[in-house]
Structure formats: structure tokens, C-alpha cells
A protein has these predicted regions:
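Conserved ATPase-coupling elements of RecA-like P-loop NTPase cores
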Residues: 57, 82-91, 115-116
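Short glycine-rich substrate-engagement loop in P-loop NTPases that contacts/grips substrate
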Residues: 45-75
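Short regulatory helix/loop adjacent to the ATP-binding pocket of P-loop NTPases
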Residues: 111-126, 142
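Interdomain hinge/linker elements that couple catalytic modules in large macromolecular machines
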Residues: 129-297, 303
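A cross-kingdom feature that marks ATP-driven nucleic-acid transaction machinery
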Residues: 3, 12-21, 25, 31, ...
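A short beta-strand-to-loop transition that corresponds to the Sensor-1 phosphate-sensing loop
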Residues: 106-110, 116, 132-133, 367
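Conserved P-loop NTPase "ATPase switch" module shared by AAA+ and STAND
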Residues: 70-87
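Conserved catalytic/switch belt of AAA+ P-loop NTPases
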Residues: 88-111, 118-120
Length: 374
């Protein structure tokens, strides 16, 4: 089994007093990880909240009944916890009234789960995000040389665990993931009724990775007003399908100040959405795929490392651009991301170096990818 980065972090706080929440898209391995970690224990109680009777059980429950149900169990796992009404209050009932029991809750939507647990569980929880497999996890599973060789494959099929483990069946698995799981939680949100428009929106975003996104222009393309586009994008982001990268602006008048790019957390899902599994050698979007790959993997690494770095891209009105920036503790790191090795010596724009003279600048290609992802 592929070792997950979160395993050690979660293991270190098991049997503690605080609840644990693990949020991430469906099928990234949240339940698999917990089952593997807790398989040798007999004091674990599992609730799968995709099941109707489990949701009914929690609908109107008291601490007395919870104590009776939990009995001698010391860990209670609540899977897909966002589906339970007032789940934060239910977890608080357990943590406040049954102090010897630790709750571990998983959720596939921060839009729902975070809003339901943050206030009731203030100071009572440890929160983690879980992503599809990472470049670093796969390097640890095999080795650096092997995973670098696999990068073109990952850029097409992504890092979902079942996809990685289903060699030769990647398209079938991605089809099921994108059709059966991708929209399950999103379409259950209040007022998300235009499912066909949502699919068109996601397809439009898939074609624009690496490019600046205008809510007005996308709205005209898919037939939605700009406010609805922004709301749907917010929900897609909080369902761990996409993420936004904003433009960096500090010192120059001609820097773009309110722009954004949108990327996918997993390129297999991105390619499934538009039905394009062509190999990278024949693709016209290979540069955009590589940019998405590097930035998504860097953000995953930063999250697991506990980094507080803020992430941006930089661009001027004269179209001078840097693909990816990080700022932490007043220090800036700038990365230009190039698939073509012949562009490995691309210089940093002079206007940027003058405005931010102490920036650490680096061009990222396949040959030095470990310098940013390990």
C-alpha cells in the first residue's frame, strides 16, 4: 500500500482529547487511510453517513443515547460527516460529555462541513486536508527516477489512488470518478439546480487552465450570469476539484491587481471532464498541463508541510508574467514553469527584478522538479 503523508500526523494525535476532521474530495483515500491505521483495533465504531439510517440515527440524538451506542469504543469514525444535520453540535456532544472518546470525521465538502463544525468545535478539533496522491508520496513508494519518468502519464491520468493502482484501466476508473462522484455533493447544495450548466462551466474552466479567467466571459460561454459563475466556482473549489490563484500586486502601477487563474487539483479529473486522454507528445495544451501539475503538487506539498506561504501568479498589463510566486515571512520565491527544456534558462523579467530585487528566482523543468516538490 502507498504510504500517505497524513498517516504519521494523524497517528501522533490518536487517542487525544480533540476531534479530528479530514476533508478532501471523494475517493482520495480518506476512509482507506483510516481503515488501514485502525484495522488492528477492536475499540473503533464506524458510521457511514452516506447511509440513510445512519443519518436518521444522528438526526435527533442526546448525549445519553450517544453514550449508550458508543459503549466501550474509544474512537468514533464518522464518514462523510457533512451529510448529517448539525454535525458540529453532535461531535461537540461527544467530546464534551464522553471525554474518553475521540471523534474522527471525514468530509468531501468544506463548503458544508466547515460551516457546520467550525463554530461548535472551536478549540476542540484538529483539521487536516487530504488530496489525491502526491509526487512526493509516489517517490517514496518507488524512487525519484521512476516517478520523473511517470510524469507524462500523471499529466494525463492524474494521481487518484484507484487510477494509479489500476494500470491499463485508468480511463474506465476516471470515467466512473468523474460521472459518479464528481458532482454528487455539489448538486446537493441548495439552489444548485442547473447541472448541465455546471458541467459546461467545469469544461470551460478545464480549457482555461494556466490562463486568466473572466467570470463575465465564462458566464457568456455557458449561459450563466457572472455572480452565479463565481458562486459555482466557489463551490467547486470547496469541493476540492479546482483552486484559484490570484495575481500578485505590491509595487508597480501596471501590475494586474484583481485577476485570477484556475487550476485543477487533479489532471486526470480535468482531462476526464473534457474527454481528452491524448499523450503529452501530441497535445497542444502540454505547457498548461505542466504548469497545472507543478503548481498543484507544490500546493499539496506546502499544505502537508504546514507551510504558511501565500501563493500567487504575477503579470503586468504589458503581459510580462511569472507563473508562480510564494511569499512567506517577507521573502518572495518566483518560479517560471517550462515543459520545453530549451527554455530552462529563461530570465526573470527585468521589471520584476527591479521591483522585487531580493527574489529567489528559478525555472522549473522535469530535470529539476524535485527542487520544488521534495
Amino acid at each position: 500500500m502507498i504510504q500517505r503523508t497524513l498517516q504519521e500526523k494523524i497517528a501522533s494525535i490518536l487517542n487525544g482529547k480533540k476531534a479530528v476532521t479530514i476533508m478532501g474530495a471523494r475517493q482520495v483515500g480518506k476512509s482507506t487511510l483510516l481503515k488501514m491505521m485502525l484495522s488492528d483495533r477492536t475499540d473503533v465504531m464506524w458510521f457511514n453517513d452516506d447511509e440513510y439510517d445512519v443519518r436518521e440515527l444522528f438526526s435527533d440524538i442526546t448525549s445519553t443515547r450517544l453514550r449508550s451506542i458508543i459503549a466501550d469504543h474509544r474512537i468514533v469514525v464518522i464518514d462523510e460527516a457533512q451529510r448529517i444535520q448539525d454535525i458540529g453540535l453532535k461531535i461537540k456532544l461527544i467530546t464534551d460529555n464522553i471525554p474518553d472518546v475521540q471523534v474522527i470525521a471525514t468530509g468531501s465538502s468544506s463548503f458544508e462541513l466547515a460551516s457546520k463544525i467550525n463554530e461548535p468545535l472551536t478549540g476542540r478539533k484538529r483539521e487536516y486536508k487530504m488530496f489525491p496522491l502526491t509526487f512526493g508520496e509516489m517517490v517514496n513508494h518507488t524512487n525519484l527516477l521512476e516517478e520523473v519518468r511517470m510524469i507524462p502519464h500523471r499529466m494525463v491520468y492524474g494521481y487518484y489512488p484507484e487510477v494509479v493502482e489500476s494500470v491499463g484501466e485508468e480511463r474506465a476508473v476516471l470515467k466512473e470518478l468523474s460521472e459518479s462522484y464528481l458532482y454528487r455533493d455539489i448538486l446537493s447544495f441548495d439552489k444548485i439546480m442547473k447541472s448541465a450548466k455546471l458541467v459546461k462551466l467545469l469544461q470551460a474552466l478545464a480549457y482555461q487552465i494556466g490562463s486568466q479567467v473572466s467570470y463575465n466571459e465564462i458566464g457568456q460561454t455557458v449561459g450563466l450570469d457572472s455572480k452565479t459563475v463565481e458562486r459555482y466556482i466557489d463551490i467547486l473549489e470547496k469541493s476540492y476539484i479546482i483552486f484559484r490563484l490570484k495575481s500578485y500586486a505590491r509595487n508597480l502601477r501596471n501590475e494586474l491587481k484583481a485577476s485570477r487563474k484556475i487550476y485543477f487539483w487533479d489532471l486526470g479529473i480535468r482531462n476526464a471532464v473534457i474527454g481528452n486522454y491524448s499523450q503529452v507528445e501530441s497535445r497542444t495544451d502540454v505547457g498548461n498541463l505542466w504548469e497545472n501539475f507543478v503548481i498543484a503538487e507544490r500546493l499539496k506539498k506546502n499544505h502537508y508541510d504546514g507551510s504558511y506561504a501565500q501563493s500567487w501568479f504575477w503579470r503586468t498589463q504589458q503581459q510580462k508574467e511569472i507563473d508562480y510566486l510564494e511569499e512567506a515571512d517577507g521573502e518572495i520565491k518566483a518560479f517560471e514553469i517550462k515543459w520545453n527544456e530549451r527554455k530552462a534558462h529563461t530570465k526573470c523579467p527585468v521589471i520584476f527584478t527591479k521591483a522585487y530585487p531580493n527574489t529567489d528566482y528559478k525555472v522549473i523543468t522535469q530535470k529539476n522538479i524535485e527542487s520544488i516538490l521534495l
